[in-house]
């Protein structure tokens, strides 16, 4: 049903003259510029850059699933609003496929089932983060590459870490998206910014 709905929405947009006029040839973003600015995720894949953290550095169960990053082959000018729309449509299809594969591979039986709120499925936090210890991890979220860095604070801080640093993809992407508005009409700004899928809460962190 979900895949059928994607197809319906896709046809709705792709058959809309207004949508095509307002998205094609608008808000070009060059792949080399995005790489230099640190832009990741579907925005850079829309420009033909084949990079996805889940594919390049597999974690969790991604290596056990049959999938490939959704990458658009944009024009020499770079990716426009329509390219960014296209890559997200393909990502929805791929995500649905990955969820179905994960459900098929998920072990069954009463031993693996827990009621919502069961303490067995809740993460157990350590009593404290020892001083001098640290950890970092990067992963792919819906808008690009995220990274968390945590440094332990020792006994004096209880469970509170000494330092937490977050690298969110939108914090990097939004300043670059503003550059893509140069030379276009004021009326194009909502389409250009919206095509980058901004999240103000993530940007503010």
Predicted features by range, described:
Residues 3-205:
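Metal/cofactor-centered catalytic core regions of large enzymes
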